[in-house]
Amino acid sequence: MKRLRPDYIFESSWEVCNKVGGIYTVLASRAQTLQETMPDRIIFIGPDCWGSKCSPYFIEDTSLFADWKKKAAEEGLNVKTGRWEVPGRPVAILVDFSVFYSKKNDIYARLWEKYGVDSLHAYGDYDEASMFSYAAARVTESYYRFYLSSDDNVIYHGNEWMTGLGILYINDRLPQVATMFTTHATSIGRSIAGNNKPLYEYFTGYNGDQMAQELNMQSKQSIEKQTAMYVDCFTTVSDITARECAQLLDKPVDVVLPNGFDNSFVPAKREFDKKRKEARKLIFRMANALTGDTFDDDDTMVVSTSGRYEMRNKGIDVFVESINRLRFNHDLKKKVIALIEVPAWMKEARTDLVERLQSTTKVFDTPLPNPVATHRLHEEGSDRVLGMMNWLGMRNDKYDRVKLFFVPCYLTGDDGVLNKSYYDLILGNDLCVYPSYYEPWGYTPLEAVAFKVPCITTDLAGFGLWANTVLGHDGTVEEGVQVIHRTDTNYNEVADDISNTIVRYSSFDAKQTAASRKAAEAISKKALWSHFIKYYFEAYDIALRKAIERKKNM
């Protein structure tokens, strides 16, 4: 049977033109592949949360849909139209959702009456996300009624629980539009893991609703669960999260959509080599300016971890522990500069460090005070990374062969210290380490290998499981991806495995290193969107067929 294809896709996410986490990368890297298939008929909808400022990821085009925007304004919708500044430059609409807060209670009441969604226990970001979601759905409805008709095959695709209210609104008010929901991580699964509960050992004993009550997550659990129940096609990003959906949301997914990568982000060889040298030189300068130690390119390994600041879930704690153990391993053949590139409650760039870095040629032989972080933090005394480093005695003394630095900011090229984007820094690495305890997919290891940096991850990450499947066995660093076995309780073994892998890699000769880097690049090419986009069209087909059946009865 020939698959149905959408004429238009409206895709909403809090991270459209709003770089917060991994979902931004999912959508931004996939955009070009969809643009090539259906140019300017994939329309992304994101939050206009920049106020009077302009989003650095959005290029406004006031002429785009000018006639519709007048109608939208009459309907109380304040939108900006333009292009998302990513490869493919897809159409993007940013909507101001603040005007709907005054209608919040009426919106939630309708949600309860029609779909049984409990918003009474809402707190934190629930209201903000829900009002955006409502606004995004209203934008889609308005655009549809202005330009389209029931003859068009239209998809409304929401990402994460934050878009659930909008999906249910479309289901209610625009049933001729097919709906699709992707959970990139169940909110209750992430919460169980983040609250130091053993997610995996007792997995089949967990009841999602019961755990939501215990962890004060009732409203997020409710909107996510009911959206999964009513949507035309329910999807997630990995087999491990598909198990979560079935167990904690009581709804098996229809399709698994593994996250791909668009390697147009990766520079060509000559530019790549130039940027790699620049990145390493900058990292060495930063480390010298902080500690007074000097670093030789042939005798220094750069190792990093990155991601959102979830100490246990992202494995930041076990990364710190593994680097600490490395300090006492006499088999280590090189110096190690280890970086934790995780945004925290950053106050400002260290002025003493900035002053030193302004001298591009001077080599320093004395350390700065407390040379462990590149930026000042609010409430440094309660920061978990700094606290763990202090407890372990990791002070980056000048003569320590292993040094760990906390880079607590978004690497967007304007942090005040490194002033390079994440992609322009990561290619300076020798290894990347992502020892996640909870990781539905894991974009960071995929990004690493795409930039020819071998990585260490775990079999609790969707990407790690996928890599094992591709390789046919547990991956090794020689093959570009070392996949470490991780459970609820083997923290110490994981720390040892990471430390030992770094030691082993430090002994590689030039030929072995080149082979490992080549293998990393090769495995990344098996995860290109050109290979994975077929799963999306499978999901679109499922959703469209259900919508067509509804149209027959309208």
What is each PLM-predicted segment?
Residues 1-554:
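Catalytic cores of nucleotide-sugar-dependent glycosyltransferases that transfer UDP/GDP/TDP-activated
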